[in-house]
């Protein structure tokens, strides 16, 4: 499970998820990627489930990169607790994902195998995603 080793502050504000991803929206390591089309908080458990789905589908072939890290603590108060008494204890860790963000990358396998692995991973995530190729991403960069 991915969690930060140490953080400066134990609790954080929720923040806003407006706009598109300005960073991490290009394929940098692999040949194929899984791109987010909606904004969401992705928990460390969801990231791990998607990673396991990809690695099992690839059957020890190819390489997988996880491009998001859950560095935001989400707090929760116990059930049936009265209001007040301060902010709850950190419950889970999430990665803030905006539209356009590349979440996973795959290399060293055929396109069909990569497409299937990424399809299985996308079912583990709570957002709409799409399969992207490095060639397509390079084409978009040249146009703009």
UniProtKB/Swiss-Prot annotation:
<dbReference type="Pfam" id="PF00252">
    <property type="entry name" value="Ribosomal_L16"/>
</dbReference>
<dbReference type="InterPro" id="IPR020798">
    <property type="entry name" value="Ribosomal_uL16_CS"/>
</dbReference>
<dbReference type="InterPro" id="IPR016180">
    <property type="entry name" value="Ribosomal_uL16_dom"/>
</dbReference>
<keyword id="KW-0820">tRNA-binding</keyword>
<dbReference type="InterPro" id="IPR000114">
    <property type="entry name" value="Ribosomal_uL16_bact-type"/>
</dbReference>
<dbReference type="InterPro" id="IPR036920">
    <property type="entry name" value="Ribosomal_uL16_sf"/>
</dbReference>
<dbReference type="GO" id="GO:0000049">
    <property type="term" value="F:tRNA binding"/>
</dbReference>
<dbReference type="GO" id="GO:0019843">
    <property type="term" value="F:rRNA binding"/>
</dbReference>
<comment type="function">
    <text>Binds 23S rRNA and is also seen to make contacts with the A and possibly P site tRNAs.</text>
</comment>
<comment type="subunit">
    <text>Part of the 50S ribosomal subunit.</text>
</comment>
<dbReference type="GO" id="GO:0006412">
    <property type="term" value="P:translation"/>
</dbReference>
<keyword id="KW-0689">Ribosomal protein</keyword>
<protein>
    <recommendedName>
        <fullName>Large ribosomal subunit protein uL16</fullName>
    </recommendedName>
</protein>
<keyword id="KW-0699">rRNA-binding</keyword>
<dbReference type="GO" id="GO:0022625">
    <property type="term" value="C:cytosolic large ribosomal subunit"/>
</dbReference>
<comment type="similarity">
    <text>Belongs to the universal ribosomal protein uL16 family.</text>
</comment>
<keyword id="KW-0694">RNA-binding</keyword>
<keyword id="KW-0687">Ribonucleoprotein</keyword>
<dbReference type="InterPro" id="IPR047873">
    <property type="entry name" value="Ribosomal_uL16"/>
</dbReference>
<dbReference type="GO" id="GO:0003735">
    <property type="term" value="F:structural constituent of ribosome"/>
</dbReference>
């Amino acid at each position: 499970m991915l969690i930060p080793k140490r953080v400066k502050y134990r609790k954080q504000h929720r923040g806003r998820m407006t706009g598109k991803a300005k960073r991490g929206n290009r394929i940098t390591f692999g040949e194929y990627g899984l791109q987010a089309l909606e904004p969401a908080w992705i928990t460390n458990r969801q990231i791990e489930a998607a990673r396991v789905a990809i690695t099992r589908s690839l059957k020890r072939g190819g390489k997988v990169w996880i491009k998001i890290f859950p560095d935001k603590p989400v707090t929760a108060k116990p059930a049936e607790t009265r209001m007040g008494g301060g902010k709850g204890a950190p419950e889970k860790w999430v990665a803030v994902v905006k539209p356009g963000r590349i979440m996973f990358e795959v290399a060293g396998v055929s396109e069909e195998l990569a497409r299937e692995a990424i399809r299985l991973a996308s079912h583990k995530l709570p957002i709409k995603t799409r399969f992207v190729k490095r060639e397509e991403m390079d084409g978009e960069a040249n146009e703009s």
